[in-house]
């Protein structure tokens, strides 16, 4: 998300690439492991890697005055986490320079 042409939320990027970074040990690096990002730990479980684990109901809308990004994180966790729904919503009110963050979960 941007405000007045400046980024409000950024990604720190990747570490230096090497063979291990593209191996089965990829998720031992902090830059790609979910426990070093702003993802919740649900009932002791972190988000899992792989195409099987993904957020759903991902949407983004934008107008001159407001930008909104919403997703349901439940699908990114193993069944053992026992999460039915975990909706995260970010709303940027551009003219007021306010970023509103909310989460609802079951």
What are the functions of these language-model segments?
Residues 1-106:
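Extended polysaccharide-engagement surfaces of secreted carbohydrate-active enzymes
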């Amino acid at each position: 998300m941007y405000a007045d042409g400046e980024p409000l939320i950024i990604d720190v990027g990747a570490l230096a690439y090497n063979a291990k970074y593209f191996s089965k040990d990829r998720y031992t690096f902090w830059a790609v492991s979910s426990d070093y990002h702003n993802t919740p730990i649900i009932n002791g479980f972190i988000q899992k890697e792989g195409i099987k684990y993904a957020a759903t109901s991902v949407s983004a809308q934008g107008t001159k005055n407001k930008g909104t990004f919403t997703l349901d994180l439940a699908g990114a966790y193993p069944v053992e986490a026992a999460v039915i729904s975990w909706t995260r919503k970010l709303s940027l009110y551009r003219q007021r320079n306010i970023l509103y963050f909310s989460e609802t979960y079951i």
